[in-house]
Amino acid sequence: MHSQADANALHVREIGKSVCIGAGPASESYLKIDAVIAAAQSVGADAIHPGYGFLAENPDFARAVEAAGMIFMGPTPETLERFGDKASAKEAAVAASVPVISGAEGARSDPEQIAEEVRQMGLPVLLKAVGGGGGRGQRLVTDETTLVEDIEGALREAKSTFGSEGLLLERFLPEARHVEVQIAGDGKGHVVHLFERDCTLQRRHQKVIEEAPAWGLPRTLLDDIARDAVRLGETLDYRGLGTVEFLVAGGEYFFLEVNPRIQVEHPVTEAITGLDLVALHLRIAEGAGLGLVQDDLTINGHAVEARLYAEDPAMQFAPSTGTLSTLSLPSGLRIDSGVEEGDAVTPYYDPMIAKLIVHAPDRETALARLATALDHVAVEGVETNRAFLTALARNHEFERMQVHTRWIDGRLDELTQAPGLTRPDLWKATAAILFVTQSRSDTNANPWTNRDAFTGWRLGLGGDAIEAGQRVTLTDSDEVSEELRVSPVKPGAKYTIHSEKGEALILSARELTPGRWRVGEGDTVHLIDARLHAGVIELDTPEGRLVFRPAAPLAFVGGDAAADRAV
């Protein structure tokens, strides 16, 4: 089923049968219980999978599905109610003897009572909306002079966003790690855990990079956390997939919340366990049980996932909408994406472009592969957080796991600052070589033309050799132009590039696979991706993505060729 805004979305194009359930805004489509039920009935469905968001944790929706004679692929409505309210979820954890963060018992909605209890607890204190989830509805109080303002703001947000003014008051753990346990239950008391994930890298309580297993923590501690997660699930005869989230600080762990649905980050668990979690979800819904026991499960290697978003880090990560005129994602890893090149990122829904999931024998290798993969992501038409993710993947503190849930927020300027190029001369010279060699080659054999970059153009005058001292003017993204002269030392292999300043570089350049180049300078080798697209040269380098606009002097073009618009 889909909204009008998603009528041409990838998931609609791929499916055999689809039903439109309303207008673009979620409140007029994906959140309309009656419309979803009617759509399912119209195609004779016997079950509904709620996905990640929208109605996935709504007990009224689960009841409506069952009342219509269909299977709700998730927990029972009663379980959703229990965990949908943070106060009752915390009570369930206490009843199961799972450690919880100290604070006032139960929810509070009276501002004066909240202020008095906060003062008794001592700052810092976290105010949490009882109906919140997924990192939303949390406000940290650190200064008593703003206490009243913070309380009133938290109450307003809880009411407007979650429909309830109830707040939980909890002691704030300033440098905690976020560890969550994936559980699966058959609804009859049999619950297993699929080990843990570490989701410590967050921005304003929103997960950015997730990994499994949790690195650098004692396995005995992680086993205790997993055992408590299973016990909590068993007390409620948990059905389906769910995630029990914890904070870990100072060798202790504390219950945070339960997400009673499949999570965005489930692929890292699939990678280390070898299980298909969606298939397991369907098996449970069919009443076939889990089909496995705890001893069947083992950890294989390390997996890391990064969420690539259409958002602008320079504008406080505001969503960026538009058409994906270019979308090039790397190979050699798992990519989960709901869009393709040419699709639109709309203002209606979460602006995620893709999830990049790397699985490797160890964490060090996984992080290195993730960073390399991010280097080779190319997106045009919208702003993205690619550079931000790359900076995280290569950060030494993160590599040593010397991070906590507020670590990103404290280093945001550093992580989002555009890095200066250390070798702009090298990349400009590389662009000149690639342009000259490609424009002189047979375009039918040119891998770039296979990407429809030059429809209607005839490039080159034929022949393999480059004329001595061929010139090309390159204009960078700052509109700074420079004329370079490319001379062959060994045609097809090594070149001398002279700049306007009289400086010279000797580089080797060889295409390994279509669009993938090996560029050498002395004993140093760089691997880059390159293409000529819409009249510009795009380079994906170890220092980021660079764009140059080339122009070759007409003096090098004969009259017939010029008339034919050859370059």
Question: Which stretches of residues belong to each language-model region?
Answer:
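N-terminal beta-alpha lobe that positions the nucleotide/phosphoryl donor
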Residues: 1-244, 248-265
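Structured core elements
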Residues: 20, 49, 126, 139-140, ...
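Catalytic cores of soluble metabolic enzymes centered on carboxylation/carboxyl-transfer
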Residues: 267-503
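Conserved nucleotide-binding/hydrolysis modules and their immediate coupling elements
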Residues: 487-527, 535
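Acidic, low-complexity mobile loops and tails
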Residues: 551-567
